[in-house]
Amino acid sequence: MPFKSDREYRNLAEGFTPQEEGKVVTGYATTFDQPYKLYSDGAYEVWEVVDRNAFNQTDMSDVIMQYDHEGRVFARTKNNTLSLRSDEHGLLINADLGGTEIGRQLYEEIQGGYTDKMSFGFTVRGDEWKDETIDGVQRSTRTIKDIGKLYDVSAVSIPANDSTSISVRSLTDGVIERLKAERLERERVEALEQRKAALRERINNGRTDED
């Protein structure tokens, strides 16, 4: 599956569902205000959440539906065979696959359960980060506030795990390194303060290391 370095990719929050009328499939590209985990190693976690207003200014003028993010186009917004709209739950996708033979074949694969996973490619124009410690685990949560452009939604044969995909790793690696550096600095400062406190106690008790 080819990934373009200037885009981010995520598995769809919920798989596509074939509709009984026509060759139409529907599903949610993402859900709003529902954090999901991108990375965890027991000591550090990276979470992400999409703000419900993230798509308000998104360029969705020519979004296409593909297979594995490459090759033939099965549906697209420009010819009204692909539509996307935000509702209370998330970004809803509706794709009419009846226009071409390969589209109808993909519909049959989705209907038969042979292909049931999807992912989408996008760019982020604005986000915010929040760091906190929960039960001894350092967590950094990214809130996506503004998605700049949505490029494609794709049926995928073997979906990349969000925690190991290239686009997610490029995001989380830097966050984990920062969290580790901040933890080391806190531990260094805490150790220094403990040594200072111990020295003050010895001085207050009239003793020094030379006693």
Regions found by a protein language model. Name each.
Residues 1-180:
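Signature of dsDNA virion morphogenesis modules
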Residues 178-211:
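Terminal short linear interaction segments
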